[in-house]
């Protein structure tokens, strides 16, 4: 399952809505990337959503 290991973001469910307003079920999946992150000086491979990845880059730039 596509799930972020940092924030726990999971797929959400909703509808595709056609022009005639028919609704069919669909799944909104988070954009999860496999990235090597350095936590406490130890590199670790994690599946992280791009929102968390962006935040990590931002925090690293400010530090």
UniProtKB/Swiss-Prot annotation:
What InterPro entries does this protein map onto? Bacterial_rp_bL28, Ribosomal_bL28, Ribosomal_bL28/bL31-like_sf, Ribosomal_bL28_bact-type, Ribosomal_bL28_sf
Q: What is the gene called?
A: rpmB
Q: Where does this protein come from, organism-wise?
A: Thermomicrobium roseum (strain ATCC 27502 / DSM 5159 / P-2)
| Gene Ontology biological process | translation
Q: State if Ribosomal protein is listed as a keyword.
A: yes
Q: Which UniProt keywords apply?
A: Ribonucleoprotein, Ribosomal protein
Q: Name one Pfam family in it.
A: Ribosomal_L28
Instruction: List the protein's name.
Output: Large ribosomal subunit protein bL28
Note the SUPFAM superfamilies from the entry: L28p-like
PANTHER family (alphabetical): 50S RIBOSOMAL PROTEIN L28, LARGE RIBOSOMAL SUBUNIT PROTEIN BL28A
NCBIfam families listed in its UniProt record: L28
């Amino acid at each position: 399952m596509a799930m972020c290991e940092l924030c726990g973001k999971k797929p959400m469910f909703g509808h595709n809505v056609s022009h005639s307003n028919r609704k069919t079920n669909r799944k909104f999946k988070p954009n999860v990337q496999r990235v090597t992150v350095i936590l406490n000086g130890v590199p670790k491979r994690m599946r992280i959503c791009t929102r968390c990845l962006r935040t990590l880059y931002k925090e690293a730039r400010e530090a």
